[in-house]
Amino acid sequence: MGLFGKTQERPPKDLVNEWSLKIRKEMRVIDRQIRDIQREQEKVKRSIKESAKKGNREACVILAKEVVHSKKAVNKLYASKAHMNSVLMSMKNQLAVLRVSGSLQKSTEVMKAMQNLVKIPEIQATMRDLSKEMMKAGIIEEMLEDTFEGMEDQDEMEEQAEMEIDRILFEITAGALGKAPSKVTDALPEPEITGAMAASDEEEEEDLEAMQSRLAALRS
């Protein structure tokens, strides 16, 4: 509190340094998220190989779709890191300008980066707060509400995604299933039916559902 009950404004340099620290912290959150998804991806790939050996083509396709969705999620997270790095570089420039002019400057580059970052669920709350602080400091203009809303990016399995599924299956099963870039139409070799294999069908389905749930949780 300053004189007469007014809140004293913080020095611009302190604001920039604090923003940079918050962004670096969120980058570490993104890094952890990427590692978690990639670890789960490796488990899914192993499961695809096992399902291929058992002749369970349906499970292979379902799991391959999960790999495609996970790859998209990881790509989005890497893109968000690039936007964060862009903001960090702009913050360094702001400090340089601050030393010369004594004030922070409006930045369209930061504005564009923050518009993208507020759409990332994993870091949305922090990025919203940072955006409001930057607006108050005059670095960016006020964002439209629809920039904050409209976060749900529904990934539809279109033709390109189907081709990617086929490629993944071909790759992971060493050609037993899928012929990139054709769509998946191949049948897996018929496995030998044993009592143990029949008994494990229900357990395999439960494992499949559990794996899908874990990946969905990591992506959300």
Curated annotation (Swiss-Prot):
- Residue ranges annotated as compositionally biased, kind Acidic residues, are 200-209
| Keyword field | Coiled coil, Cytoplasm, Endosome, Lipoprotein, Membrane, Myristate, Protein transport, Transport
Q: Which GO terms describe its cellular component?
A: cytosol; late endosome membrane
Region annotated Disordered, chain positions: 196-220
Please give a single GO biological process term from the UniProt record: protein transport
Identify the stretch(es) annotated as Important for autoinhibitory function: 168-169
UniProt subcellular location: Cytoplasm, Cytosol; Membrane; Endosome; Late endosome membrane
Q: Lipid (N-myristoyl glycine) attached at which positions?
A: 2
List the Pfam families hit by this protein, alphabetically: Snf7
Q: How does it sit in the membrane?
A: Lipid-anchor
For whether the record's keyword set contains Protein transport, the answer is: yes
Where on this chain is MIT-interacting motif (motif)?
201-209
* Site feature: Interaction with STAMBP: 214
Q: Which residues form a coiled coil?
A: 22-54, 197-220
Stretch list, region Interaction with STAMBP: 203-207, 219-220
Subunit:
Probable core component of the endosomal sorting required for transport complex III (ESCRT-III). ESCRT-III components are thought to multimerize to form a flat lattice on the perimeter membrane of the endosome. Several assembly forms of ESCRT-III may exist that interact and act sequentially.
Role played: Probable core component of the endosomal sorting required for transport complex III (ESCRT-III) which is involved in multivesicular bodies (MVBs) formation and sorting of endosomal cargo proteins into MVBs. MVBs contain intraluminal vesicles (ILVs) that are generated by invagination and scission from the limiting membrane of the endosome and mostly are delivered to lysosomes enabling degradation of membrane proteins, such as stimulated growth factor receptors, lysosomal enzymes and lipids. Involved in late stages of cytokinesis. Plays a role in endosomal sorting/trafficking of EGF receptor.
By sequence similarity, the record places it as follows: Belongs to the SNF7 family.
The entry's protein name is Charged multivesicular body protein 3
Q: What is the lineage of its organism?
A: Eukaryota, Metazoa, Chordata, Craniata, Vertebrata
